[in-house]
Amino acid sequence: MLDMMNNSLSYNRPECINFQNNSVQKNVIRVCENEPNTFVGSGIPSQIIGKQGDIYLDRITRIYYKKINGVWVKNVCNNHRCCYPKECKGNPHTKGEKGETGPKGIKGEKGDRGLKGEKGNNGDPGEKGEKGAKGDKGESGEKGAKGDKGDKGDIGEKGEKGDKGDIGEKGEKGDKGDIGEKGDKGDLGEKGEKGDPGQKGEKGDKGDFGDKGDKGDIGEKGDKGDIGDKGEIGNKGDVGEKGSKGDKGIDGTSILFGFGIPSPDLGVDGDLYLDANTDELYGKVNGQWIPITNLKGEKGDKGNKGIDGEKGNKGDTGDKGIDGSKGDKGDTGNKGDIGDKGDQGIKGDIGDKGEKGDIGEKGDKGEKGIKGDKGDIGEKGNKGDIGDKGEKGDKGIDGDKGIKGDKGDIGEKGDKGDIGEKGNKGEKGDKGDKGDIGEKGDKGDTGSKGDKGDKGEKGDKGDKGEKGDIGDKGEKGDKGDKGDKGDKGDKGDKGDTGDKGDKGDKGDKGDKGDNGTSILFGSGPPSPDLGMVGDLYIDVTTDELYGKVNAKMNDNIRVSAKVNVNKQITLQATGQWIPLTNLKGDKGDKGINGNKGDKGEKGDKGNPGTNAGKGEKGDKGDKGDAGTSILFGQGAPDPNQGVDGDIYIDTLTGELYRKVNGLWVPEIDIKGDKGEKGDKGNAGDKGTSGEKGDLGSKGEKGDTGEKGDKGNKGDRGDKGIKGDIGSKGDKGDIGNKGDKGDRGDKGIKGDAGLKGDKGDIGQKGDKGTKGDRGDKGEKGDAGLKGNKGDIGLKGDKGTKGDRGDKGTKGDRGDKGDIGNKGDKGDKGTKGDRGDKGVKGDKGDKGNKGDKGNIGIKGDKGDRSDKGLKGDKGDKGDTGDIGLKGDKGDIGEKGIKGDKGINGSKGYKGDKGDKGSKGDKGNKGDKGSKGDKGDIGIKGSKGDKGDKGDKGSKGDKGDIGSKGDKGDKGDIGTKGDKGTKGDKGIKGDIGSKGDKGSKGDKGSKGDKGDIGSKGDKGDKGDKGSKGDKGSKGIKGDKGDKGTKGDKGIKGDKGDKGIKGDKGDKGDKGDKGIKGDKGDKGDKGDKGDKGTKGDKGDKGDKGSKGDKGDKGDKGDKGEKGSKGDKGDKGDKGDKGDKGDKGDTATCEIVNTDGQTRVSACNTGFVKIEASGYEITTAPNGSSDLAPDPFDPSNVSGMNTKLFGIQNGAFRSGNFTATNLSDIGQYSAVFGYQTTATGSGSIVYGINNSSGISSGSNGSLVGGLANTGGIIRSFSGAEGSIAFGSSEINGIITTGFGAQGSIVGGYSSGGTIATGSGANASEAFGQATTGSLITTGPGAIGSSTRGYSVGNSVITTGLASWASQITGYASNSGIIFSGSGTSTSDIIASVTDSSTLTIGDGSIGSSIRGYCSSGSLISLGPNSNGSIINATVNNFSTLITSSGVNGSSIVARANNSGLISISGNCFGSQFVFNSINGGNITIGSTHAGSQIVGSANTSGIITVVGGLNGTLVAANSSSTSGVRISTSFGSLLAGNATTGGWFRPGQAQGSVIAGQASASGVILTAFNAGCNVIGYANRGSTLGINQNAFGYSVMGYADLNSTITSNALGANACRIMGYALNNSTIFMDSLVAANATDLFGYANNSGVIQAADQCAGALARGVAQNNSSIVTRGNGSMTFGFSNNNSTIFTGQFSDGCFVGGYANSGGTISTGSTSPASHVFGFSNSGSFITTGNNTNASTVFGYATANSTITTGANSNGSLAVGYTGSSGELLGALGQTSFAIGRNNTASGAYSGAIGISSYANMEGSFAHSSFQDTVNPVSAGRSQNIKVMGRKVGTQIVLANGSYATLPYDGYGDVFARLIGSSGTAVGLTFQVTRTAGTYTVAPPITPSGGILWLSPSGVAAPPLAITALGTSGFTITLTDAQNYNCYFDIVNYSS
């Protein structure tokens, strides 16, 4: 069993036994005590051989066994499952697993050649293997010792400069500097925005009209009165007969509408045309269409804020942003720490693995490859890297993709900060510029008056505002609640109309007048029966404009089809009201003024309208018909112009008038109110002029503004001065990028990109010694993020070079026997050198291109950490190189230090120092495990190589060849190289020569068989030839294994870099002899291996010692038996046989071949070359006629075939008569009939019949001119087919169940009979033909092509039937009524129709409808399905009752999809484009609606949606409108001008995205939730009454998340507002108890508008952003940074504001907001303040770095408490009877006080109280203590402080009270007066008390010498001569005026 072949057990190690024959099983018990042994034998191994860990290969089965716990375990190889050779060949993936052994396989490949013995003869490189095994590697092992120092390299990881990268993050603060630019007063500007609402007040004037509007609301009801007028039209209906006057109606102006510019031939002079796409209104004059106006309201008003845009000046500050960019990298540095994981990431580089191909250079390790042969398998390892593809490794160059580190550049996403340039839009931030207005605000306390302008809005309530009514109305009309009174007015209106109604009677004649367009008014959507086609209808509640069109957008359609049962089917599309546009522009704020609409009550007078009964007088209405004329002009209409009922449009204002009783009455402004959205226009002010930001210096003027308390904010303007620097930013257009820097904050997101920076952390890679883990590093492949390559620096791990130990895996190369292919892989071993490749991380430098990010490079310093990648290098060995791309970043050459890794060979060497330990080299025997070391290539484990004591790992030193990676060393530029110093460790190795013992390891080589696995990878770039590793591993020539199946011949690998000549290892089994390695030291001549299969010819290795002549190959197997030879030539004719007996049963012709025999009972045998049947009894074959000739009228006698019920009847057949065929018969001919069941009938039928009357028959033929092809009734299971023309019929009989009918019919019919269940009719029907199943044909199918008024249908009540087909040219496809569960699959074009009849429950339509065609689902077709496309003015219609149904359809090119009737639990999936219109009516409970509207497509849901789900997409000016939804889920996407407008929504959820001017807005909303994303000028929100709802989302790029609903109580709005976007509560009335929170950045705004009482706003405001509430009892708090603002608006009494304000930020209440409270922290030029005139308010907080805590001007009775730092901060109380407590305080109001250090007081009756303490005795003997007193004058200040000479800057006087407390317990109280007159100071101590001394303590103590001296123009001093130290306390009372 045990076959000790030459390759079986060959050991050169003295401690191992070398078996050379098969008889020594008993001596095999312990072949080698220190290492596992490999046995090769035939059959299952005996349990008596081997020891724990030994391997046994059954040469017969190629199954490996491992001895575990005394038992041979099958299929275990080095703790891995082994595969069968075929498996290996068949599953390259498994190869991947064993890739470790794969390297051996590499040898195997060459080994194949070894099998050739050719190279084997060359001295059996195995001898060289001997060297490999021992000493050579041992030498390398010595170097390994230094490798131990490599571990110190791990300490290098501590050197993580990456941490410094964190400092780079500080650079991010630089970004904040960018924000500083925004810091411009722009924040105050936001208050200026409040001023903008003042402008809205202007609109309020219109609002006055709004008051009327309120009436208008009532008026709307009044409009209903108008509807009453329509009632008159109804009367006209009665009079309609008189239509003659209607002709005059024709004279009336028609309003036409369409999509696009009107056609010149459309309409007549005086007509109007409305372009539904643009809302442009045209009038026809002299035959030409002239644009008159645009019905859309203007939004422009808000553009005023655009003025604010000027603040862009501060944008200049953006220059700092440039610095910030560096900061970004700093951030990345932090992530760099994470980079440690990045080590794995290095493998991520491997992800580039093609790049690893570069590691393929490691292929140089291939020299190890001599071991490398195993290395070939290693190539598999490459596969691990996919390295075989290592050439792909060149892709490794792609590894430059590692540049993904460039992703760090993604940090450049900070560049998105460049988007921050959009930050330049931040210039829109110029809205902050509004802040500039805010600067005015500075003055703008007065500006606050602007806020009063808001009060002006109250003015809006003024009736005068009424003019605005019409525009703003409607929405504000919500206020129209008062308008309810107006409702009475409505009645009045009706009355008026009613009178006209009388005229309406004549209007009846006006029916012709209908040609004139009527404009109707009403509340809510129009009733379907209201108005005529062409009329317009205005919903006064929503200002929605509807037009009445017929269902097909043209004439009514009437389609009829004649069915075989003569049933008439009529389809008619009646006029439908289609929403055209909304006359109102954005509902402007002015709507608020609409409140005054109460006056609308005057409409009550309209009550007389109840006289509508007079409508009979409507005859006069005939004239009224003319009244329908629409006039237009500029300005108000002339009283003499027009007649009652006429309409007049003022083209200047858009005001619409109606003439009533001879007076022009304004009714509505067809132009919508200018919406508040105009405010966004402010953003438009991009104020790119922001460069004017230099004007920010005007902010300095803001200092002047200080006169205005807000002027303090002007101080912030000083920062604006920095903005001047920002002007440099102008230069810095790049600086603008700096602006991006602002966004750069977001750029922090970029940090993710910075992950590349993580590479920096890679420096931690120094830990690379951990590289042992590098194995895991392979997982790192995912780490491609590592590509950020900065990580590449990890190259430091180069120490992994130790991994070279893995080279020991080369031992596996023995297995290489199998992997002959592996030879090429040898080069792959050089890949080991790839470890140096870690330097390849330099490739990271490629990232430097990213450096464009600039600052980020700074982070690169962190990159030194990247050395970690070095660990990877081990792994890579193939693809790690890909990291090179990263190199650019890493330039740190330090990585080259990785080359030191070559020293790794020395791995063992470290222990070598212990030379004595070399004995441990025995452990090296374990080195065989080193084979696993190949896995070690992952390198990090290589560090474990230190255990190199096992010396065998020293063999891994071969891996040192990885030094090749050094090519990548480019990255090494990083200087981190220092890690390289570790390399020096190599020197120590020299001692380690002991290692030679390791050579024994060769035994492992057996595993090499596995090597076959590695398909020869693509030839990787030839890695730099690594240090020639000790070749020895190749050494032990394994016993020549049983000649394995010739391993899959891998691709011939590139000739591996010839590894260093290894120590002469034990002569390995010859098989390994694959690649001829460098000629190693001549090893012991190995046993002559069995001649292996001839491998591919390997690269010619250095000529090895001449190997033993291989054994003669086995004799080939006997070839398979050859193919049967060709048939031999025919033999000679045999002799004629004897004459036989004469036969009586056979007749033979003289030719000997023609014969007839009847020798067998019952059979006649004929042998002849031809046959004839004669018709005459004389047997002559020459007689005519031919029995088959038509002239044969007597037929052919077939009686001989007349078997009972046989195939043919008895008798003669003629050519024209084949009738009456019996049962089981067949008939062929003309006009044929078969009567027998199971018959077959074929024929040609001219106006007659081809038929079968029996079951299971088949009938076919041609029927023409009324001919019939059929099976008769009862012919179940029959088939009828053919061609039926000119009224021909192809049919089965009635009740012919399971039958089939098919064919072609032109004007004919193809049908199954009635009741023909489970039947099928198919074919083509043309020219009025019919393809159908009969009525009641359950489970039947009809399919075909219907053209030319033809019909494809199932019969009535044909349940579960199916129709499939195509209908064209008025073709019809339909299922009959009651055809439940039927199915139609069809296409209809050219005015064709596809229909499911009434009551077709559970049916389905799948079809295409084009060119004016119709798809229709009949009423009560519940549970049905329609999947269809409606195109080119076609229509898809359902009637009522399609509950539980599903409609999936597309409407295109003005196609119409209309769903009417209640649909419960149904599903609708639509796409409406190119003017397509989808309308869903009635109620849809529990349904699902999914749709997309594009290119002016419209989806309208008219009915209520209860518990319904709607998902829609609207783009390109398209829209989705939903009337009412309860408990529903509405989701939509509105882009490119698209809109998604749910109507009344209660308890519903609305989610969506609005982009590119898209709009998602709901109307009345209660208890709903609106969620979404608004981008690029889009809007998301609610615009009508709303209660208890929630809006949340993300708004970017001038977008808005809003609620501009009236009465939005108890609601919540939340989200993220960025880049001039707004999260906005724009409720005009009673928006109480709302909650607003979010994040606002880059001029973003979070705002609760006016009258939001009890509101709560909170969040973060950055970069000229603001968080605002306006309403009593509100609360606002958050974080305000970079000129951002947190505040409440004007007149917001009793509010609470708090937070943190930084970098010019402001926390404030609005002006005139008494009893408010402000608290917070103010830093870097920020403000915490109340607004002006905020009486009885409080401010408290902390202010530092030139920040301010103050009450506003004239904020009487207020309190300011806090702490201010010493750098010029100010804590002030600016109103009367106010109080300031803290440091650097001011009490600037009369009767106020300030207490604290550096206190100020400057008004009558005020005081400042201050104290100080001086341990140096400020008033000791001989010293003077200066008391600084700043004089008093109205508006100035008094200061008491411990400064230099006290002065009074202004003329005036005051009393000073001082208490001096001495250190000895004495005290002195004194008083004096100081006066300044004309710049000269005098001091006047009072006479009483004497000298000003008020008292002494203790009493009786002598008064110290005291002098108070005026210093002329310098102030005054107090001199106290005493030996004590004094503490002083001062009070000053000011008396001057």
Swiss-Prot record:
Domain of life: Viruses
Cystine pairings recorded for this chain: none
Glycosylation sites: 6, 21, 515, 902, 1178, 1192, 1212, 1217, 1245-1246, 1255, 1317, 1422, 1427, 1432, 1443, 1452, 1477, 1494, 1506, 1513, 1533, 1598, 1619-1620, 1632, 1641, 1663-1664, 1672, 1682-1683, 1732, 1735, 1746, 1756, 1784, 1842, 1934
Pfam families reported for this sequence: Collagen
Chain segments carrying region Disordered: 88-248, 294-531, 583-643, 670-1144
Domain Collagen-like residue range list: 102-161, 168-227, 297-356, 363-422, 453-512, 672-731, 735-854, 867-926, 936-995, 1023-1142
Biased composition (Basic and acidic residues): 296-514, 584-605, 614-625, 670-899, 907-1141
Record's keyword terms, sorted: Collagen, Glycoprotein, Hydroxylation, Repeat, Virion
InterPro entries reported in the protein's UniProt record: Collagen, Collagen_Structural_Proteins
Post-translational modification: May be hydroxylated on lysine by the viral-encoded procollagen-lysine,2-oxoglutarate 5-dioxygenase.
Entry GO CC: virion component
Localization per Swiss-Prot or TrEMBL: Virion
PANTHER family referenced in this protein's UniProt entry, alphabetically: COLLAGEN ALPHA-1(XXV) CHAIN (PTHR37456:SF3), SI:CH211-266K2.1 (PTHR37456)
Function in brief: May participate in the formation of a layer of cross-linked glycosylated fibrils at the viral surface thus giving it a hairy-like appearance.
Protein's name in the database: Collagen-like protein 7
Organism: Acanthamoeba polyphaga mimivirus (APMV)
